[in-house]
Amino acid sequence: MAGNTIGQLFRVTTFGESHGLALGCIVDGVPPGIPLTEADLQHDLDRRRPGTSRYTTQRREPDQVKILSGVFDGVTTGTSIGLLIENTDQRSQDYSAIKDVFRPGHADYTYEQKYGLRDYRGGGRSSARETAMRVAAGAIAKKYLAEKFGIEIRGCLTQMGDIPLEIKDWRQVELNPFFCPDADKLDALDELMRALKKEGDSIGAKVTVVASGVPAGLGEPVFDRLDADIAHALMSINAVKGVEIGEGFNVVALRGSQNRDEITAQGFQSNHAGGILGGISSGQHIVAHMALKPTSSITVPGRTINRMGEEVEMITKGRHDPCVGIRAVPIAEAMLAIVLMDHLLRHRAQNADVKTEIPRW
């Protein structure tokens, strides 16, 4: 499995399985001298952690991160930072009945086709449990971006099922279990989740992530365009089936006169491009959206096959999220932070001496 690393100068490599002993990651490229403690990482991990509300999986994992290396006397040393989270609440017996059965909509079938075997306990490496380490690594990037450049990264749920959620108040996001920015829709979300639980079904969601304070000039055309790398990072998150930058697919219905972000002496007059032009940041807010499919881990009976190719009917037992989009919010923030930090370091390495007289807003 060769796809465990993301980034060039800021590099994150994760390891571990859903029901293994632990999850871990190695973070390379962190500059020396940055104050860093486990508490700095724990806040976002707690936001992603399972079992924190009745709307998410009831697997109870404390997700306490340990810094194994790369930090001395409370500051980064410039060497590899090793992070570890122990798994403590595995219930592998929940999966014994599907050892020889491929869950529809999951990676069981494709993992076995590729590797000739699979860890059937909670999906093994294909489980979203792996994303805990992305969030830990992303917290390092978020801290660096905020303290050194004033960059703020925020995410929220902007749609669940057929319920659209307007970004009315960012402060609301941390005050409810849905990461919802629209307090008027909380009752509707609660009603939907209760219905799903009763039916044993699940629902999809849309997550929006925004980075403010990003300087103009980040991105490496042509193959490492900033939007291309953001799309790559967000698409690598479990259950994500689509990514949009700025207006995204809405541009299909727009005229050029509507979509172009006109510029005056006061700055850009709109941000349909989502803060990226020609693969390079424009200095505006970077705005990305991702669509997450409804999880296939449901108790509604469905058809599939076993290893012998025989058709069988199955339900998925275990503890699962009825809407995986809820806990995906801090994961999306982490992946955007990882990409932005990598591109900031790359930009400084080649273009640190570049000066222009063009206005910046």
Curated annotation (Swiss-Prot):
CC cofactor: FMNH2
Key words of the record: Amino-acid biosynthesis, Aromatic amino acid biosynthesis, FAD, Flavoprotein, FMN, Lyase, NADP
Residues engaged in binding FMN: 125-127, 238-239, 278, 293-297, 319
Binding site for NADP(+): 48, 54
Domain of life: Bacteria
UniProt GO BP: amino acid biosynthetic process; aromatic amino acid family biosynthetic process; chorismate biosynthetic process
Any one annotated GO CC term: cytosol
UniProt GO molecular function: chorismate synthase activity; FMN binding
Enzyme Commission code: 4.2.3.5
Top-level class of the enzyme under EC nomenclature: lyase
A Pfam family of this chain: Chorismate_synt
Family: Belongs to the chorismate synthase family.
HAMAP family: Chorismate_synth (MF_00300)
Protein name, entry field: Chorismate synthase
Organism annotation: Salmonella paratyphi A (strain AKU_12601)
UniProt lineage: Bacteria, Pseudomonadati, Pseudomonadota, Gammaproteobacteria, Enterobacterales
